[in-house]
Amino acid sequence: MAAIRPPFTRETAQEKVKFAQNMWNTRNPEQVSKGYTADCVWRNRDAFFRGTNKIIEFLTEKWAKEKNYRLRKELFAFTDNKIAVQFWYEYQDSHDGMKWKRCYGLEDWTFDYETGKMKKRQMSANDIVLGRDGDGVAVPESGIEGRWYLDDVDVDDPSVTEKLTDAHF
């Protein structure tokens, strides 16, 4: 992620977003943490912290809870050294009977000009349970959403964005 440095163009901002998506989909906290400055400031929902060790600790706990995690990030907006993304991911919640859930949210990122690493990350998101009682199976006639990221679905498939729009707007 650090190889792409600000100031961003539409193309480089898009590359940064997809690189981050791919890194997060590895679910490797140590590898993911390399994209952030040593003193990076994070807000993730109601958690506020700073620094590489805290990032690794947070991500380790996150992915211990969020099993079968699959994430999609899309470029929302950008300026010189800032990028905003919308994202959604699905996972099975190991703290809630392995129910399938989908998280929807927005992030804003600020990058260091010299290193290209993220120096601030703020995330706000909400979760919904998928299927009846979290089984992940859609029941359209009842308005119950199911999983989008079935095992053979590419997270970058354009139909996922269409599903988001159709389901909620």
Can you annotate each of these PLM segments?
Residues V41-K62:
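Short solvent-exposed beta->alpha transition segments
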Residues A3-F8, E57-F169:
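A beta-strand edge to alpha-helix "cap/lid" segment located at domain peripheries
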Residues M1-A38, K163-F169:
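Short, low-complexity N-terminal intrinsically disordered segments enriched in polar/charged residues
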Residues N25, T37, V41, T60-N68:
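Short helix-capping and hinge/turn segments at secondary-structure transitions, especially at repeat
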